[in-house]
Amino acid sequence: MNYKDQLLKQMVDGKYDRKKYLNMYQRKYNLNSPKISTKPVTIDRARFLVKNKQENQTESSDLNNTDSLVDSNSDNQTNTTDTSTNNVENLNENVTEESTNDTNKDTNIETNNQTKILSPTKSFSPNKKVMDNVLKNQDKISDTERIRFLEEKVSKLERKIRTLSLQMTKISGRSNRFTDKSIKVGPKVYH
């Protein structure tokens, strides 16, 4: 007895069980296999991934850059040390500029919003989910789409009611053809 016949027999006998139906369906399509769980990306995890990506890019650029390679000649070594000290000075200047910019940002935030005080040492909560604006826009459904969706649901339920009523009439021994008054058989002929 195939799957469909089993289901019809259960419905006709009145022994239809939703739980059994779902189990049969899952066995048929192997839906009990474990699925890969997708964890939401936290802000800390995102920062960690970005940091690793940046480090990998700098390492690959260092390997491609011929100036960073040290030659065996001593003249080249002195030149590289001079450039490295210049680079360190430039980095120190950039760090001081960034720190002054950060303090300016903090004061702006404090003056604009007294309830929230953000500082570079404080971070957001580690388990906060990163939300997409696209999903928020898709969640908003217009009234016409909502009405269409509800009408489809109603028509689906009406079809289910019709099939169940047909099954009930078959079970009770009456035929639907003779009880439906909209069907006209034809004029009666008397001899």
Curated annotation (Swiss-Prot):
Residues 52-112 are annotated as: Disordered. Keywords: Coiled coil. Residues 71-94 have a biased composition (Low complexity). It comes from the Viruses. Residues 57-70 have a biased composition (Polar residues). Residues 138-172 form a coiled coil. This is Uncharacterized protein R292. It comes from Acanthamoeba polyphaga mimivirus (APMV).
